[in-house]
């Protein structure tokens, strides 16, 4: 067992990745005002412009969590009405490229900031847990959403990605669903940088 754990890859890119808090916002949401929210928006836009201009950054994603942050989950229904508990990890299309997480079926569409739609991606473990063998005809809906609106339809699964270990290897693979949108705000920036350029990135 120890040897297996030492030699098991987590299933995602671990080299030349930096996780840094860059916005430093107060967690006391009651202190937020319209003016402070506008100021935050301006700071984030300026920060994005600086990151986009950095020649040592390959990709970045702002978030409230990194790839190893413990996630929460909820019950989803498949096309037979069967209930399955899935972990939820909010992501953008850049997340999968940043960590070299392989798409094994389907395609993760490019979603720009003007297009506010969200699509569903699952890992192999989630596809299996839902009772599907392919994304053809596969869809899901949150149990709570269906309970609130009996006429709500399933949302299609657009892609399946390779499994990876989200935490300790002994915890195994977790069936995970990824609501994928254009951008998710957060103080934590996950940055993939050019190999050998960490110092230059920090100095930038």
Language-model features: where?
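Active-site-flanking beta-strand signature of metal-NTP-handling nucleotidyl enzymes
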Residues: 18-24, 188-190
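Alpha-helical transmembrane segments
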Residues: 1-16
């Amino acid at each position: 067992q120890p040897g297996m754990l030492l030699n098991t890859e987590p299933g995602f890119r671990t080299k030349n990745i930096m996780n840094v808090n860059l916005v430093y916002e107060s967690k006391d949401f009651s202190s937020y005002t319209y003016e402070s929210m506008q100021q935050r928006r301006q700071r984030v836009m300026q920060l994005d412009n600086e990151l986009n201009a950095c020649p040592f950054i390959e990709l970045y994603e702002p978030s409230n969590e990194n790839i190893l942050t413990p996630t929460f989950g909820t019950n989803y229904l498949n096309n037979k009405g069967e209930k399955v508990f899935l972990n939820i990890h909010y992501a953008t299309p850049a997340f999968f490229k940043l960590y070299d997480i392989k798409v094994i079926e389907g395609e993760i569409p490019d979603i720009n900031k003007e297009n506010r739609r969200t699509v569903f991606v699952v890992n192999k473990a989630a596809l299996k847990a839902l009772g599907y063998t392919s994304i053809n005809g596969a869809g899901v809906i949150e149990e709570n959403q269906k309970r609130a609106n009996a006429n709500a339809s399933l949302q299609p699964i657009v892609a399946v990605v390779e499994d990876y270990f989200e935490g300790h290897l002994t915890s195994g693979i977790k069936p995970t669903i990824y609501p994928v949108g254009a951008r998710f705000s957060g103080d934590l920036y996950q940055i993939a940088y050019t190999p050998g350029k960490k110092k230059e990135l920090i100095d930038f």
